[in-house]
């Protein structure tokens, strides 16, 4: 595995790969790798000749400085994992390499509408940070494919819009959420959970599933009552609820009666840890 820390060296390597017509797959990460990342790498291998994984803890997408400071930095462990799965290139840049003039003077990229709602409303500037670093990585690496998990569904949708509207010739491929046996979605933030919170956390997806089952069975006018009861149940379990509702699968607007494909999005706090999850459903009208 070739570990690259500068854009200059990365450009040279990409130029060589492009000349040899190698298909490049990019898996962007912030490190602290788990089985979800590994599944993304394995998926990338099905499409790509060359696998590039980036590890960059992007300060631009953190709305909380203490969250940034406490984010796990596990480069040695991560690099061992990446070597084990035969990743070709690990791009591991320093912050000054990505933002040489500082974040406050950084030109940014933003998918305006979708970045301002839901998670974007709760975390101002977060998605601007995501789309700016993803744009930079796309420009540096020029991948044929880029791979993202579906757990961060709003982020996935934003990146798809970014690719379409900026005319990137990149295929975005998504991976269904990887879960523990108890249903908890894998996330680097799960490390923040206490032992007691780890016992409570799986209830989020259990309640999501039950809610979806009820929504499919019941009439449309009963839906607000179902959502409300599920929120109350989450609160009783110890969660603080930020987002818990169904949205149009394509644009995250509240669905009209004609929309059948919807997604239940959940964003909650458990102690000091933010957990997000979702489930797609097809409504019967």
Curated annotation (Swiss-Prot):
EC number(s) given by UniProt: 6.3.2.1
GO biological process, any: pantothenate biosynthetic process
Subcellular location(s) of the protein: Cytoplasm
UniProt binding sites for (R)-pantoate: 61, 155
The UniProt record lists the keyword Hydrolase: no
Active site: residue positions: 37 (proton donor)
Reactions catalysed: (R)-pantoate + beta-alanine + ATP = (R)-pantothenate + AMP + diphosphate + H(+)
Keywords annotated in UniProt: ATP-binding, Cytoplasm, Ligase, Nucleotide-binding, Pantothenate biosynthesis
GO MF term (any one): pantoate-beta-alanine ligase activity
InterPro entries: Pantoate_ligase, Pantoate_ligase_C, Rossmann-like_a/b/a_fold
Metabolic or biological pathway, per its Swiss-Prot or TrEMBL entry: Cofactor biosynthesis; (R)-pantothenate biosynthesis; (R)-pantothenate from (R)-pantoate and beta-alanine: step 1/1
Binding residue positions for ATP: 30-37, 149-152, 178, 186-189
One cellular component term from this protein's GO annotations in UniProt: cytosol
SUPFAM superfamilies, per the entry: Nucleotidylyl transferase (SSF52374)
Location (main, coarse): cytoplasm
List of residues binding beta-alanine: 61
HAMAP family per record: PanC (MF_00158)
Oligomeric form and interacting partners: Homodimer.
Record's miscellaneous remark: The reaction proceeds by a bi uni uni bi ping pong mechanism.
Family from the record: Belongs to the pantothenate synthetase family.
Free-text function comment from the UniProt entry: Catalyzes the condensation of pantoate with beta-alanine in an ATP-dependent reaction via a pantoyl-adenylate intermediate.
The name this protein goes by in its record: Pantothenate synthetase
High-level lineage: Bacteria, Pseudomonadati, Pseudomonadota, Gammaproteobacteria, Enterobacterales
């Amino acid at each position: 595995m070739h570990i690259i820390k500068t854009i200059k060296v990365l450009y040279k390597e990409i130029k060589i790969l492009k000349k040899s017509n190698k298909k490049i797959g990019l898996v962007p990460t912030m490190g602290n790798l788990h089985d979800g990342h590994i599944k993304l790498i394995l998926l990338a291998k099905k499409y790509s000749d060359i696998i590039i994984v980036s590890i960059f803890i992007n300060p631009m997408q953190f709305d909380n400085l203490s969250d940034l400071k406490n984010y796990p930095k596990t480069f040695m462990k991560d690099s061992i994992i990446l070597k084990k799965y035969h990743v070709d290139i690990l791009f591991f840049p320093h912050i000054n390499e990505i933002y040489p003039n500082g974040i406050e003077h950084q030109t940014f990229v933003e998918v305006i509408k979708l970045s301002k709602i839901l998670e974007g409303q709760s975390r101002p500037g977060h998605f601007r940070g995501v789309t700016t670093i993803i744009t930079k990585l796309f420009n540096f690496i020029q991948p044929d494919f880029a791979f993202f998990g579906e757990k961060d569904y709003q982020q996935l949708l934003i990146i798809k819009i970014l690719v379409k509207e900026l005319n990137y010739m990149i295929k975005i491929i998504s991976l269904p959420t990887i879960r523990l046996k108890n249903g908890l979605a894998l996330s680097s933030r799960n490390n923040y959970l206490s032992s007691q919170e780890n016992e409570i956390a799986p209830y989020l997806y259990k309640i999501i599933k039950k809610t979806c089952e009820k929504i499919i069975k019941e009439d449309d006018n009963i839906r607000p009552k179902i959502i409300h009861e599920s929120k109350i149940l989450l609160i009783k379990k110890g969660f603080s609820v930020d987002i818990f509702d169904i949205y149009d699968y394509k644009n995250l607007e509240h669905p009209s009666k004609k929309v059948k494909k919807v997604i239940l999005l959940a964003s909650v706090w458990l102690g000091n840890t933010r957990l997000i999850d979702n489930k797609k459903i097809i409504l019967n009208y």
